[in-house]
Amino acid sequence: KLGRESWDKKTDAQKKDIIAKGSDAIRRASREGSKLEKFILSELTKRKYKVQFHREQWLKNQNLETDLFIEDLRTVIEVDGPSHFEPVWGEENLIKNQRSDLEKTGLVLEQGLVLIRIKQTKRISNRYMRTVLNELLEVIDRIEKKFPEENKRYIEI
């Protein structure tokens, strides 16, 4: 309620400025990687995994890129933020994102790779990022011990 009261006290110009700054931050994160993507990249690299970040033009559809790719484990990691399941940019863009996700999932699995999708449904906090990292490390550990059978290569966290 407090946030709503604060918002209601803002002028239209202030509201417009806040929305523009928020939109810019989200667009920048989609180009440069989200905080969670960068955290995972950093932590995996510390653990000596060779991780390719925002790899482009290697799936059949050159417009698709993967967030993180561990080639030695034949594993792709996708971090799906709110725009993958909420109409952050409108209904049309949500549908477009979901179609793109389905296409990417199919292309990754077609190549015999593992796809780990991390669904970012909570606000980013250090605790949340550590929890996600621990779950991811458990999955990676299982993949290292035994590469999953074909019907078990799609994993959600």
Region roles according to the model:
Residues 1-157:
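Nucleic-acid endo/exonuclease domains
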